[in-house]
UniProtKB/Swiss-Prot annotation:
The gene is ntrB. It comes from Rhizobium meliloti (strain 1021) (Ensifer meliloti). Member of the two-component regulatory system NtrB/NtrC, which controls expression of the nitrogen-regulated (ntr) genes in response to nitrogen limitation. Under conditions of nitrogen limitation, NtrB autophosphorylates and transfers the phosphoryl group to NtrC. In the presence of nitrogen, acts as a phosphatase that dephosphorylates and inactivates NtrC. This is Sensory histidine kinase/phosphatase NtrB. One of its GO terms (cellular component) is cytoplasm. It catalyses: ATP + protein L-histidine = ADP + protein N-phospho-L-histidine. InterPro entries: HATPase_C_sf, His_kinase_dom, HisK_dim/P_dom, HisK_dim/P_sf, PAS-like_dom_sf, PAS_fold, Sig_transdc_His_kin-like_C.
Length: 382
């Protein structure tokens, strides 16, 4: 039997490809004609196309018309020197909205005209900035809620009492007006009560939790009530380590997210909600002013096939009083952001037509195996 000979350099090429595929950033090689000569696995995911498909097209087919990336490529070819460009907008129907990236473009000296491009998505850093904005907004609601509880609820109780007294002495035609006064005061009191949740800054007990037990419990509540006609399925990572959190608050978070998904789906017959969990070890956040990095490897998602969130609303979705619901208060998602932020995590939303995903990223609990039960989770199956 004759063994296949290895061509000179073939082993080195295989090693180079293995190294490039191990990089967690999208990397592509563009040849002298502008065609994609190589794309690593992350680039396939980034562009939503296979390496073979990418290789049959000019790079301009995959980025927005007039993108500054094309200018950078020409600049690197002319100067034969690498450049860095920050916060380049590659937003497009193909790549999605809010696609900000940092770019590193370098010449391949052994192949004149060819350049290698490394993409570093800015989305995570920008999401952290938005989370800080959400927390500041929640703090402003906290102060407002404390003031409203004292300055508004007390007078409202007097107004409602007076309306009830009037109701006993007016004719039937005017009784509807006194009833309206009572109903509206009740509505305002209910709104203030919901806002008072923001002013509760008491420390909460946290324990290592099995997130799947929490999600199953929330699913059972949803199927018994508002989501009884909607298919809810799950795709869990069984090896997920525990999350260090307060169980009641996590139930509140995911009950809110699943209810939002159910309301978005409405009465459509093919409505479906998908719950997923995953371990993403590559997500690490820098802490301002220190060398510390926080790892947020636990990813919990609520997906739905509703109509999607309006693009103009998406950047403000977690701000207080933002809602598309006729009778909504706009406080549910703001509370979700406050709770998750208080646990050291972040929450984000990605929405396109017929597909919306709410993604919660949280730190893992230290010192417990993934399958170890805790007092908070033992025996909890929803």
């Amino acid at each position: 039997m004759t063994e296949k000979a290895t061509a000179p350099g073939e082993g080195a090429n295989d090693l180079s490809m293995a190294v490039l595929n191990a990089i967690q950033n999208p990397v592509i090689l563009v040849d002298e004609n502008g065609f994609v000569a190589f794309a690593n696995w992350e680039a396939e995911s980034f562009f939503g196309a296979s390496a073979n498909h990418l290789a049959r097209h000019d790079i301009s087919a995959f980025i927005p018309f007039g993108s500054p990336l094309l200018t950078l490529i020409e600049q690197v070819r002319e100067r034969r020197a690498a450049v860095n460009e920050y916060r380049v907008d590659l937003s497009s129907p193909r790549l999605g909205a809010d696609k900000l990236v940092d770019l590193y473009v370098a010449p391949v000296l052994s192949q004149p005209g060819s350049v290698v491009i490394v993409f570093q998505e800015r989305s995570m850093a920008d999401k952290i900035d938005r989370q800080l904005t959400h927390r500041a907004a929640a703090r402003s609601v906290t102060g407002l809620a404390s003031m409203l509880a004292h300055e508004i609820k007390n007078p409202l109780s007097g107004i409602r009492g007076a309306a009830q007294l009037l109701e006993t002495s007016v004719n039937d035609e005017d009784r509807s007006l006194t009833r309206l006064i009572c109903d509206e005061t009740d509505r305002i009191v209910s709104l203030v009560d919901r806002m008072e949740v923001f002013s509760d800054e008491r420390p909460v007990d946290r324990l290592p939790l099995n997130i799947h037990a929490v999600l199953d419990h929330v699913k059972a509540i949803a199927k018994a009530g508002f989501a009884r006609r909607i298919k809810i399925s799950e795709h869990y990572d069984p090896s997920l380590p525990p999350v260090f959190a307060n169980r009641d608050q996590l139930v509140q978070v995911f009950l809110n997210l699943i209810k939002n998904a159910a309301e978005a789906i409405g009465d459509r017959a093919d409505g479906e909600i998908l719950l997923t969990t995953a371990y993403r070890p590559g997500i690490r956040l820098s802490v301002a002013g220190t060398r510390e990095k926080i790892s947020l490897p636990l990813e919990f998602c609520v997906h739905d096939n509703g109509p999607g969130v309006p693009p103009d609303l998406l950047p403000h979705l977690f701000d207080p009083f933002i809602t598309t619901k006729t009778n909504g208060s706009g406080l549910g998602l703001a509370l979700v952001a406050k709770i998750i932020g208080g646990h050291g995590g972040i929450v984000e939303c990605d929405s396109q037509h017929s597909r919306t995903t709410f993604r919660v990223l949280m730190p893992a609990s230290k010192g417990l195996a993934a399958d170890e039960e805790t007092p908070m989770t033992k025996g909890t199956n929803g």
